[in-house]
Amino acid sequence: MNINSLWISTTPRTGSMWLYNVTREILKFSKINVLPTKIPKSSLEFFEIFEKQSLIDQNNSNKYVFKIHRILNPNLPRSKILTTIRDPRDVCISFKEFMKTDFNSALKAAKDLLQYEKIYKTYNKDYVKFFRYENIENKS
Protein backbone atom coordinates (compact mmCIF):
# COMPACT_ATOMS: atom_id res chain seq x y z
CA MET A 1 0.00 0.00 0.00
CA ASN A 2 1.30 3.44 -0.93
CA ILE A 3 0.90 5.49 2.24
CA ASN A 4 1.11 9.22 1.68
CA SER A 5 -0.90 10.51 4.66
CA LEU A 6 0.12 10.35 8.30
CA TRP A 7 -2.58 11.25 10.79
CA ILE A 8 -1.64 12.39 14.30
CA SER A 9 -4.88 11.50 16.05
CA THR A 10 -5.30 11.70 19.82
CA THR A 11 -6.67 13.87 22.60
CA PRO A 12 -5.07 17.18 23.61
CA ARG A 13 -2.26 17.23 26.22
CA THR A 14 -0.76 13.90 25.15
CA GLY A 15 2.23 15.07 23.12
CA SER A 16 0.36 15.29 19.83
CA MET A 17 1.92 18.62 18.82
CA TRP A 18 5.39 17.26 19.57
CA LEU A 19 4.67 14.14 17.47
CA TYR A 20 3.24 16.28 14.67
CA ASN A 21 6.31 18.53 14.54
CA VAL A 22 8.82 15.68 14.85
CA THR A 23 7.07 13.68 12.12
CA ARG A 24 7.20 16.66 9.77
CA GLU A 25 10.89 17.31 10.55
CA ILE A 26 11.91 13.66 10.05
CA LEU A 27 10.22 13.65 6.65
CA LYS A 28 11.86 16.96 5.68
CA PHE A 29 15.25 15.65 6.80
CA SER A 30 14.63 12.62 4.54
CA LYS A 31 14.19 15.00 1.58
CA ILE A 32 10.45 14.38 1.39
CA ASN A 33 8.09 17.18 0.42
CA VAL A 34 5.89 17.65 3.52
CA LEU A 35 2.38 18.91 2.95
CA PRO A 36 0.35 20.92 3.64
CA THR A 37 2.91 23.71 3.77
CA LYS A 38 0.47 26.06 5.50
CA ILE A 39 -0.81 24.42 8.67
CA PRO A 40 -4.63 24.26 8.73
CA LYS A 41 -6.44 25.59 11.77
CA SER A 42 -9.24 23.02 11.91
CA SER A 43 -9.95 19.33 11.44
CA LEU A 44 -12.31 20.24 8.62
CA GLU A 45 -9.47 21.89 6.69
CA PHE A 46 -7.28 18.81 7.16
CA PHE A 47 -10.04 16.56 5.81
CA GLU A 48 -10.60 18.86 2.82
CA ILE A 49 -6.90 18.69 1.95
CA PHE A 50 -6.96 14.92 2.39
CA GLU A 51 -9.96 14.51 0.07
CA LYS A 52 -8.98 17.09 -2.56
CA GLN A 53 -5.20 16.66 -2.65
CA SER A 54 -3.75 13.72 -0.76
CA LEU A 55 -6.04 11.03 -2.16
CA ILE A 56 -5.24 11.92 -5.75
CA ASP A 57 -1.57 12.84 -5.28
CA GLN A 58 0.58 10.26 -7.09
CA ASN A 59 3.93 11.93 -6.39
CA ASN A 60 5.89 9.57 -4.10
CA SER A 61 7.99 12.50 -2.87
CA ASN A 62 4.92 14.07 -1.25
CA LYS A 63 3.75 13.09 2.22
CA TYR A 64 0.86 14.71 4.06
CA VAL A 65 0.90 15.10 7.83
CA PHE A 66 -2.41 15.86 9.51
CA LYS A 67 -3.20 16.48 13.19
CA ILE A 68 -6.67 16.12 14.61
CA HIS A 69 -8.35 15.46 17.93
CA ARG A 70 -10.89 12.86 16.89
CA ILE A 71 -11.01 9.13 16.34
CA LEU A 72 -10.50 8.14 12.72
CA ASN A 73 -12.06 5.30 10.76
CA PRO A 74 -10.11 2.05 10.50
CA ASN A 75 -9.81 2.24 6.72
CA LEU A 76 -8.69 5.66 5.50
CA PRO A 77 -7.05 5.07 2.12
CA ARG A 78 -3.31 5.63 1.75
CA SER A 79 -3.07 6.50 5.45
CA LYS A 80 -1.43 5.54 8.71
CA ILE A 81 -2.48 6.75 12.16
CA LEU A 82 0.12 7.85 14.70
CA THR A 83 -1.36 8.23 18.16
CA THR A 84 -0.01 9.15 21.56
CA ILE A 85 -1.11 7.61 24.81
CA ARG A 86 -0.48 9.01 28.27
CA ASP A 87 -1.38 8.19 31.85
CA PRO A 88 -4.99 9.47 32.10
CA ARG A 89 -4.28 11.02 35.51
CA ASP A 90 -1.55 13.15 33.95
CA VAL A 91 -3.86 14.10 31.07
CA CYS A 92 -6.49 15.25 33.57
CA ILE A 93 -4.02 17.42 35.51
CA SER A 94 -2.33 18.81 32.39
CA PHE A 95 -5.64 19.55 30.68
CA LYS A 96 -7.01 21.37 33.73
CA GLU A 97 -3.84 23.42 34.20
CA PHE A 98 -2.99 24.35 30.62
CA MET A 99 -6.48 24.60 29.17
CA LYS A 100 -7.68 26.66 32.18
CA THR A 101 -10.79 24.55 32.56
CA ASP A 102 -12.84 22.93 35.30
CA PHE A 103 -12.23 19.46 36.72
CA ASN A 104 -15.17 17.82 34.90
CA SER A 105 -13.88 18.97 31.51
CA ALA A 106 -10.40 17.73 32.39
CA LEU A 107 -11.81 14.39 33.54
CA LYS A 108 -13.69 14.07 30.24
CA ALA A 109 -10.40 14.59 28.35
CA ALA A 110 -8.82 11.77 30.34
CA LYS A 111 -11.79 9.48 29.64
CA ASP A 112 -11.65 10.40 25.95
CA LEU A 113 -8.03 9.25 25.83
CA LEU A 114 -9.06 5.84 27.17
CA GLN A 115 -11.64 5.62 24.39
CA TYR A 116 -9.02 6.43 21.71
CA GLU A 117 -6.75 3.72 23.06
CA LYS A 118 -9.55 1.16 23.33
CA ILE A 119 -10.72 1.75 19.76
CA TYR A 120 -7.30 2.06 18.13
CA LYS A 121 -6.12 -1.19 19.74
CA THR A 122 -8.79 -2.99 17.66
CA TYR A 123 -7.34 -1.62 14.38
CA ASN A 124 -4.81 -3.37 12.18
CA LYS A 125 -1.35 -3.01 13.75
CA ASP A 126 0.09 -1.89 10.40
CA TYR A 127 -2.44 0.95 10.29
CA VAL A 128 -1.88 2.41 13.79
CA LYS A 129 1.36 3.20 15.61
CA PHE A 130 1.24 4.03 19.34
CA PHE A 131 3.68 6.41 21.06
CA ARG A 132 3.76 6.57 24.85
CA TYR A 133 3.99 10.12 26.19
CA GLU A 134 6.22 8.92 29.02
CA ASN A 135 8.74 7.60 26.46
CA ILE A 136 8.69 10.91 24.58
CA GLU A 137 9.16 12.83 27.81
CA ASN A 138 12.00 10.61 29.08
CA LYS A 139 13.97 10.50 25.83
CA SER A 140 13.62 14.08 24.58
Model-derived features: positions:
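PAPS-dependent sulfotransferase catalytic domain
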Residues: 61-140
